[in-house]
Amino acid sequence: MAAAKKAVLGPLVGAVDQGTSSTRFLVFNSKTAELLSHHQVEIKQEFPREGWVEQDPKEILQSVYECIEKTCEKLGQLNIDISNIKAIGVSNQRETTVVWDKVTGEPLYNAVVWLDLRTQSTVENLSKRIPGNNNFVKSKTGLPLSTYFSAVKLRWLLDNVKKVQEAVEENRALFGTIDSWLIWSLTGGIHGGVHCTDVTNASRTMLFNIHSLEWDKELCEFFGIPMEILPNVRSSSEIYGLMKISHSLKAGALEGVPISGCLGDQSAALVGQMCFQDGQAKNTYGTGCFLLCNTGHKCVFSEHGLLTTVAYKLGRDKPVYYALEGSVAIAGAVIRWLRDNLGIIKSSEEIEKLAKEVGTSYGCYFVPAFSGLYAPYWEPSARGIICGLTQFTNKCHIAFAALEAVCFQTREILDAMNRDCGIPLSHLQVDGGMTSNKILMQLQADILYIPVVKPSMPETTALGAAMAAGAAEGVGVWSLEPEDLSAVTMERFEPQINAEESEIRYSTWKKAVMKSIGWVTTQSPESGDPSIFCSLPLGFFIVSSMVMLIGARYISGIP
């Protein structure tokens, strides 16, 4: 029997999409942008202490190998020749910090995830050293001093992890965000691996000057970071190195394929949504929620709590584009919390069913400030609250309130962006895993009171990385010229409530947010003395209650 004929599809491009919750490898047809096959692996998060969030860098790397291998197997089953994969792009969770040993290839500590809060006291101490009239950190980086970004995570590792300290002293340490760790490992690791990052990921470290597009000596001195451990900064679209066979990757079919695209996940989604024009914006619903608006070649500094960041630089000789960004820490993560911590759902998909049963939160509001509040508040003292509960409230109302919370947070950052840009968005382009939830998308349209537009192919983050890789000089299989970009079919959600009702719900949400702020300081019980009496009002209440109880027993004659 003759072997099945391989399908001829033209050049293919692969994309590693390494997120906070999962890793995926996807393969696209570079001529049509069609997704041909993919594989996904969920990634564990570790919570060793209150407010700490870590991941195992080796597990992340192994998940990439597994996804590549399984996707190649699936392509084989479809009779698609994997030798047609001409390039690979990488998109990644940003800010998450890894330090590893370049001699052994071993991570020196777990990856400290972007959501992690352990550096709050470091941030407070550093903020005292910034002159009030000269915030050089924000003017150079576009970022507020926050636990969110890599510099303070790296500072914590240098201060607290002996292995990291020793490796730095012995010139064995390399630092990187997840993209750097993956590219170094995939291009050979200890056998000539390429230590690099791209401008979008570098711009999230708080060590990178977004004007000069270089590591900044003054910033490195301020945070006490040795510059020799930093990766080389490259554009988002160029050949960084070639795939090398690993003992962890059974099939060596992708050996020699160039890794030629790299963008932080939110920049990748901006490219994948084809927001190449000044003023175009997208909102990605993943573990967190991230609204980016392309501001062209101009750095626009927000007066309303948004970040200024590098959007992309698609080639060594191509211009840099900037973006305004509103970041929400907890979006999809609240669904995972309802599943793993409260146990009111068994799978993420169940939340849509629960919310649909009631169609309202019945006055229940959920502020999921598990890692403080990001834009537009930048308030690390906030913690999650559920308020407006009655005896009637059940798990369906809480599920609905959780979805509403994602939409309310998006409304806050959209309002801030409209004020900064001066021109309100007429519609919102969306992407990310949560957009498959139709209840969420309709709620978002109702709360914003503008249409929400969702592409039929939701994998825009991976698509953006693939586009950057395929368009790189020396690869040239993907044209980014407007006339060559494939048209994308869209699903549209129109507002279905009146504007007055939308405003009432939003203003009540804002009241709930105010109640979530001020719960924690670095001197609070969660980081210090666990004694109940470190809360003076509570201690006084307990003591006075005991005195009253003893007095009552005495007066009534009870022995």
Swiss-Prot record:
Binding site residues for glycerol: 94-95, 148, 265-266
**Protein name as it appears in the record:** Glycerol kinase
Q: Where does sn-glycerol 3-phosphate bind?
A: 20, 94-95, 148, 265
Q: Where in the cell is it found?
A: Mitochondrion outer membrane; Nucleus; Cytoplasm, Cytosol
Annotated coiled-coil segments of the chain: none
Residues bound to beta-D-fructose 1,6-bisphosphate: 252
Give the family this protein belongs to, as stated in its UniProt record.
Answer: Belongs to the FGGY kinase family.
* Residues that coordinate or bind ADP: 20, 24, 287, 332, 433, 437
Entry keyword Mitochondrion: yes
* Chain segments annotated as transmembrane: 532-552
